[in-house]
């Protein structure tokens, strides 16, 4: 069984606004991951609700939706050895205040709700998310 995986990563509007795209993508590439697809776009609430379907209805969802639709983001598919766990480790914990130095959120994050990046959490999520953002890849 191969340990090559694909994962979806979003560089959220705060990463784009703060001009951190090159720095973040460079970190992924330096770790040996390959960008297989990438697109800059501003999403609407329909896509946000599909992407974050498991969060719709929770107390924090309205703020999440407002943030993720507030400006352009970068959606990309990264591929490589154990890509899902590698990317999640590189990103750091969701709450930037708790993220370790050396992680993307630990080095650049400013708050829990504006935490720069999203990454698929498992193979099933990766396939679902890649299908939503890049249907031609599934």
From Swiss-Prot:
It catalyses: a 2'-deoxyribonucleoside 5'-diphosphate + ATP = a 2'-deoxyribonucleoside 5'-triphosphate + ADP; a ribonucleoside 5'-diphosphate + ATP = a ribonucleoside 5'-triphosphate + ADP. GO terms for biological process: CTP biosynthetic process; GTP biosynthetic process; UTP biosynthetic process. InterPro entries: NDK-like_dom, NDK-like_dom_sf, Nucleoside_diP_kinase. GO terms for molecular function: ATP binding; metal ion binding; nucleoside diphosphate kinase activity. It is found in: Cytoplasm. It is an enzyme of class 2 (transferase). The active site is at residue 118. GO terms for cellular component: cytoplasm. ATP binds at residues 12, 60, 88, 94, 105, 115. Its cofactor is Mg(2+). Coiled coil: none annotated. Pfam families: NDK. Its EC number is 2.7.4.6. Keywords: ATP-binding, Cytoplasm, Kinase, Magnesium, Metal-binding, Nucleotide metabolism, Nucleotide-binding, Phosphoprotein, Transferase. Homotetramer. Major role in the synthesis of nucleoside triphosphates other than ATP. The ATP gamma phosphate is transferred to the NDP beta phosphate via a ping-pong mechanism, using a phosphorylated active-site intermediate. PANTHER family: NUCLEOSIDE DIPHOSPHATE KINASE (PTHR11349). Belongs to the NDK family. NCBIfam families: PRK00668.1. This is Nucleoside diphosphate kinase. It comes from Cutibacterium acnes (strain DSM 16379 / KPA171202) (Propionibacterium acnes). The gene is ndk.
């Amino acid at each position: 069984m191969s340990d090559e995986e694909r994962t979806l990563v979003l560089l959220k509007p705060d990463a784009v606004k703060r001009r951190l795209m090159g720095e973040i993508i460079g970190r992924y590439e330096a770790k040996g991951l390959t960008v297989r697809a990438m697109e800059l776009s501003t999403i609407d609430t329909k896509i946000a609700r599909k992407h974050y379907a498991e969060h719709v209805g929770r107390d924090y969802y309205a703020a999440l939706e407002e943030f993720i639709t507030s400006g352009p983001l970068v959606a990309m598919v990264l591929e490589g050895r154990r890509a899902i766990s590698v990317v999640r480790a590189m990103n750091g914990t969701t709450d930037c205040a708790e993220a370790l130095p050396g992680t993307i959120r630990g080095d650049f994050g400013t708050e829990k709700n504006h935490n720069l990046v999203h990454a698929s959490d498992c193979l099933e999520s990766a396939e679902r998310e890649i299908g939503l953002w890049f249907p031609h890849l599934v």
